[in-house]
């Protein structure tokens, strides 16, 4: 399915710019949550510190293992309780090793706290949030078709295509083609994935693979 035939209803990817890269670290959820949080803060706050968010989410996991990912509850609690500063307060460390020193700076600057909550997995509810200009955090299974999107094409594959892992992205738009919706997602695999780090997912690909959806309250506290 060609993107050129898609009737786009909402697209606020320009609010974010080109996607960043998480490298080989399991930080996709921290990237997705940080981008959604920064959008909720608004006022040109810039990028928020993924490192700070991931550190505090890891601290809230039972194993406290930086080499594995974190779950929705951990990142949600971390951003609500611990918050996060701007990226400059603790820049991302793409090559952090398992035994490297790792602790937040004493004075990272202003801290932004946000309330990230779960929402319905119904894709109609996702579209409702996008219609309001609110990005939606998505945690989903990903299969082979997700890893190398064909240029100018909408990602789609049978629900039987084997899952290769669980990944977090954010939805920043949607459109329709032949009475079916597709969703524009922002990834954290750098600009070489998709189109500058973005790609379209057909509803038939997303719906059976979606595990968690979440949005930030638009009420943000700064300390």
Identify what each model region corresponds to.
Residues 14-23:
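Immediate flanking context of iron-sulfur cluster ligation sites
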Residues 1-15:
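Non-catalytic, low-structured ubiquitin/UBL-interacting segments
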Residues 28:
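Short cysteine clusters
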Residues 5-7, 22-24, 34-38, 59-186, ...:
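Predominantly the structural core of cysteine protease catalytic domains
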Residues 13-14, 56-60:
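Acidic/histidine-rich, surface-exposed loop or edge segments in extracytoplasmic proteins
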Residues 38-54:
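Phosphate-handling active-site elements
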């Amino acid at each position: 399915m060609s993107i050129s035939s898609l009737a786009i209803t909402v697209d606020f990817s320009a609010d974010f710019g080109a996607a960043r890269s998480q490298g080989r670290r399991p930080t996709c959820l921290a990237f997705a949550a940080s981008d959604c949080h920064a959008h909720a803060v608004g006022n040109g706050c810039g990028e928020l510190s993924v490192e700070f968010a991931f550190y505090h989410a890891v601290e809230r996991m039972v194993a406290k293992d930086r080499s594995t990912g974190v779950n929705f509850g951990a990142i949600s609690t971390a951003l609500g309780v611990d918050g996060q500063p701007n990226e400059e307060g603790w820049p991302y460390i793409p090559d952090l090793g398992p035994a490297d020193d790792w602790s937040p700076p004493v004075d990272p600057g202003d801290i932004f706290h946000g309330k990230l909550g779960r929402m319905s997995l119904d894709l109609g509810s996702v579209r409702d949030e996008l219609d309001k200009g609110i990005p939606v955090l998505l945690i989903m299974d990903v299969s082979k078709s997700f890893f190398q999107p064909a240029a100018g094409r909408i990602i789609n594959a049978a629900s039987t295509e084997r899952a290769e892992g669980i990944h977090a992205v954010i939805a920043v738009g949607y459109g329709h083609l032949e009475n079916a919706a597709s969703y524009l997602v922002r990834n954290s695999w750098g600009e070489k994935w998709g189109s500058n780090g973005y790609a379209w997912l057909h509803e038939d690909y997303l719906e059976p693979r979606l595990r968690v959806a979440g949005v930030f309250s638009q009420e943000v506290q700064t300390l």
